């Protein structure tokens, strides 16, 4: 029998051994479980990463899963320079998944650097479907009536980029509307345009001159019909041809106003004519005869016309204007107006105070800091003094500089506003915004069919444009800088109401004219003219009415297009005009009156001025007046608005 001490020692040893084995077994079990758990985590993570990669690939595929099947410029494949134009893009979704994304249209200079702001259009496509997406870019004109060095690119999906074909140029475009299915009859001299591509707002019809119809458009929505009638009222020409039944089309709804027994009649400033033949018979000779009174495009050197009826014969062109070299560029482009507006925001600094502050600043830096160091013999004091001087004078220069700009943002604008039958206004405007605080600004107007562009040819603009029915322009403007932009829009109201009280003609010229006017005040008016036939007349205010004051000559004499080639620049045609250094804001607004007249009549050449002629039953009144609040940018952060607007109102003359 062992002693108690030996038994106790053996028990401790045995217990410790068993406990150790137990701990080792537990540790081994935990290691096995940990390995299994780690392998599970690894597998789970791998599956998650794989799922994310697959989802990303699917999303990338979906985001890119659209094909561009067709691209069309303008109404007949061409563009009007220095105007907003339509770019129609046919997009298809070939996948079983719906597509929701956006497409971006960007402009590049020579295919390299991006300039101007990007134009963005949202796109939604059902599986295996297609649709037309329309952009409304502003196309600048270069010397010689060409597109110049700018190119356009479409961006979509995740990095997909497609170059848009370079457009041909046609200031006046003529088309015949086709069934949107493309299954209609063919033939004839006019370019075909699918009816569903016709715009829904008047602001997008720049460049359209003639529309031929041999059937009623079946797919038009009410806004397209409204736009079409407004376009005619402002001067468009409609040609009605025989359809497949051998008869003229019979229109219904709002378009029923086109039904008439007359073969040639007026609709506002526009014209509706009937030509008793089908489209295949409407050849070049018939078209030239029908359009003999309409302005035509000028053929450029070494250019072969695709559509002969659109162009002036080169021989006729040279005879009409032997000095055509002087008409190489449009003198009334957006840049000419925006350049004048930009000059209106000029700082009026207190230069005496600024110079005094400058020399004080120099003296405090040296020898001020040097003397400070000798006095205290401590580099920390010198550094503190230098830093304090820089901070103090930075603040002071900022305050004095802001006072030079009036310490406020400013918007200056000019506009052309053409009266519409419903009391609305078809507006083309140019604006310059100056801001003292840098930020993103949203530019928006209270109207429909707003189109925006900076018209920039050399600078990339950090902004995004959404054109269309509810258009807007969001742009980053640095502090103490300008942003110019052009706008086309329809305002719902604001047209002056003018009525003829009396008039008298002598040898087809106005001898007397008295007009009642409502909507424009005498004190807000700068200039008033009237156009009757091919002649301008001066009007003046008398007892709250407008009365004839004198004959201002024919359109060519009034507009002086050849003399206005460099109106917005110096006498050499480039650079800054120092002769206008002292001009006031009012002086610059007055300077733009005649160019705005030319622009409103779509005149950029002497030969075009000689073709200006209104129907004999209309007088067009031009009022250059203070811009009302309805034209202003709808933004409280952009401060005051100052501008002038040229109202163009067609007034029917009573039948004598």
Where does each model-flagged region fall?
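Aromatic-Pro/Gly-enriched surface loop or interdomain linker
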Residues: 83, 139-210, 265, 270, ...
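Short edge beta-strand/loop segments characteristic of extracellular beta-sandwich folds
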Residues: 86-94, 514-518
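Intrinsically disordered, low-complexity Pro/Gly/Ser/Thr-rich segments with frequent PxxP/GP/PP motifs
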Residues: 106-143, 538-570
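A glycine-centered loop/beta-turn motif at secondary-structure junctions
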Residues: 193, 207-208, 237, 253-367
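Short alpha-beta junction capping motif
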Residues: 206-249, 269-275
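Accessory, solvent-exposed terminal regions and/or long lumenal/extracellular loops of proteins
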Residues: 347, 427-656
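Internal/C-terminal transmembrane anchor helices
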Residues: 380-403
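Alpha-helical transmembrane signal-anchor/signal-peptide segments
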Residues: 401-422
């Amino acid at each position: 029998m062992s002693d108690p001490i030996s038994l106790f020692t053996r028990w401790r040893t045995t217990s410790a051994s068993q406990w150790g084995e137990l701990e080792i077994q537990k540790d081994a079990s935990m290691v096995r479980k940990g390995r299994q758990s780690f392998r599970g985590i690894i597998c789970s993570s791998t599956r998650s990463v794989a799922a994310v990669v697959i989802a990303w690939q699917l999303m990338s595929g979906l985001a890119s899963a659209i094909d561009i099947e067709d691209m069309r410029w303008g109404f007949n494949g061409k563009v009007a320079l220095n105007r907003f134009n339509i770019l129609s893009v046919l997009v298809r979704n070939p996948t079983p998944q719906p597509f929701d994304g956006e497409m971006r249209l960007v402009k590049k200079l020579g295919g390299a650097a991006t300039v101007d702001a990007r134009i963005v259009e949202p796109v939604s496509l059902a599986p295996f479907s297609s649709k037309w997406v329309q952009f409304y870019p502003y196309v600048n004109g270069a010397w010689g009536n060409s597109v110049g060095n700018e190119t356009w690119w479409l961006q979509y999906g995740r990095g997909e980029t497609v170059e848009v074909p370079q457009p041909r140029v046609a200031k006046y475009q003529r088309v015949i509307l086709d069934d949107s299915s493309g299954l209609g009859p063919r033939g004839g001299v006019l370019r075909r345009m699918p009816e569903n591509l016709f715009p829904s707002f008047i602001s997008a019809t720049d460049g359209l001159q003639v529309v031929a119809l041999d059937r009623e458009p079946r797919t038009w929505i009410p806004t397209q019909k409204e736009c079409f009638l407004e376009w005619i009222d402002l001067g468009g020409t409609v040609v009605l041809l025989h359809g497949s039944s051998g008869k003229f089309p019979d229109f219904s709804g709002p378009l029923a106003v086109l039904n008439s027994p007359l073969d040639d009649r007026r609709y506002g400033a526009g014209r509706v004519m009937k030509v008793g033949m089908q489209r295949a018979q409407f050849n070049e000779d018939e078209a030239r005869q029908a359009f003999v009174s309409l302005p035509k495009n000028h053929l450029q050197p070494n250019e072969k016309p695709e559509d002969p009826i659109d162009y002036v014969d080169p021989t006729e062109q040279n005879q009409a204007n032997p000095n055509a070299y002087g008409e190489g560029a449009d003198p009334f482009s957006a840049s000419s107006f925006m350049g004048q507006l930009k000059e209106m925001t000029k700082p009026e600094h207190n230069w005496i105070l600024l110079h005094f502050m400058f020399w004080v600043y120099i003296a405090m830096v040296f020898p001020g800091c040097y003397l400070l160091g000798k006095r205290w013999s401590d580099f920390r004091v010198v550094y503190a003094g230098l830093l304090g001087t820089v901070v103090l004078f930075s603040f002071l220069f900022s305050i004095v500089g802001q006072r030079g700009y009036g310490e406020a943002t400013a918007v200056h604008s000019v506009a052309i506003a053409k009266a519409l039958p419903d009391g609305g206004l078809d507006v083309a405007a140019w604006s310059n915004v100056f801001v003292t605080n840098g930020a993103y600004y949203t530019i928006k107007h209270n109207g429909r069919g707003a189109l925006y562009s900076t018209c920039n040819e050399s600078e990339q603009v950090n902004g995004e444009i959404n054109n269309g029915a509810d258009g807007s322009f969001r742009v980053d403007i640095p502090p103490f800088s300008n942003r110019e932009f052009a706008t086309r829009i329809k305002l719902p109201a604001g047209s002056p109401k003018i009525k003829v009280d009396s008039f008298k003609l002598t040898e087809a010229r106005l001898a007397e004219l008295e007009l009642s006017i409502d909507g424009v005040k005498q004190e807000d008016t700068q200039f008033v003219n009237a156009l009757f036939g091919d002649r301008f007349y001066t009007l003046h205010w008398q007892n709250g009415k407008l009365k004839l004051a004198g004959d201002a000559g024919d359109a060519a004499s009034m507009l002086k297009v050849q003399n206005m080639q460099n109106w917005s620049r110096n006498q050499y045609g480039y650079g800054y005009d120092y002769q206008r250094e002292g001009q006031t804001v009012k002086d610059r607004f007055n300077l733009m009156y005649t160019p705005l007249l030319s622009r409103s009549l779509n005149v950029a050449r002497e030969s075009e001025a000689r073709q200006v002629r209104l129907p004999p039953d209309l007088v067009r009144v031009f009022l250059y007046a203070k811009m009302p609040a309805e034209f202003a940018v709808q933004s409280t952060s952009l401060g005051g608005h100052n501008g002038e607007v040229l109202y163009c109102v067609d007034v029917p003359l009573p039948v004598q």
